[in-house]
C-alpha cells in the first residue's frame, strides 16, 4: 500500500487551498513556488514525474491519503484521491478538522487517531485484505 500524508502531488499549485489556506496553515509559509521551480530545474512543473496528479495512476497500489482543513496541500490531497479512484485504485481519504500541514506535531488526539488509521491501513495491506 501507499501512504500519502499531506502529499505535494501538484507542483503547479493549481488547487484552491494554496490560496484559501495561506493564512491558516501554521506550518507552511505560503506559496512554495520558488522551491518548486528550483527543484524542477528546467522541467515543466506539471510533468507527472514532478506532479503525479497529472500522470497515469493506473496500477498504483491501494492508497491512504491524509490532510487537514488548514493544510496548504488539502487540494492536492483531495484531487489526488479523486484521480486515484478514477484510475480504479482503492483509495481512502482522511481529512482532519483544523489540522495544518504535518499535523499537530504528534501530541494531540487527532495525531494519535491518524497514527492508528495508518497502522490499520498498513496492517490490512500486509495481511492482503
Annotate each predicted stretch with a short phrase.
Residues 1-129:
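Alpha/beta-hydrolase superfamily serine-hydrolase fold, recognizing
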Amino acid at each position: 500500500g501507499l501512504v500519502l500524508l499531506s502529499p505535494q502531488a501538484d507542483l503547479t499549485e493549481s488547487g484552491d487551498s494554496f490560496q484559501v489556506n495561506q493564512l491558516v496553515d501554521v506550518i507552511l509559509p505560503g506559496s512554495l513556488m520558488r522551491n518548486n521551480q528550483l527543484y524542477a530545474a528546467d522541467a515543466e512543473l506539471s510533468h507527472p514525474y514532478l506532479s503525479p496528479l497529472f500522470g497515469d495512476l493506473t496500477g498504483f497500489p491501494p492508497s491512504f491519503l491524509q490532510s487537514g482543513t488548514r493544510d496548504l496541500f488539502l487540494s492536492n490531497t483531495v484531487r489526488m484521491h479523486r484521480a486515484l479512484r478514477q484510475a480504479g485504485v482503492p483509495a481512502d481519504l482522511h481529512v482532519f478538522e483544523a489540522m495544518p500541514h504535518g499535523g499537530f506535531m504528534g501530541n494531540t488526539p487527532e495525531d494519535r487517531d491518524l497514527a492508528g488509521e495508518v497502522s490499520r491501513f498498513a496492517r490490512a495491506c500486509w495481511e492482503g485484505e
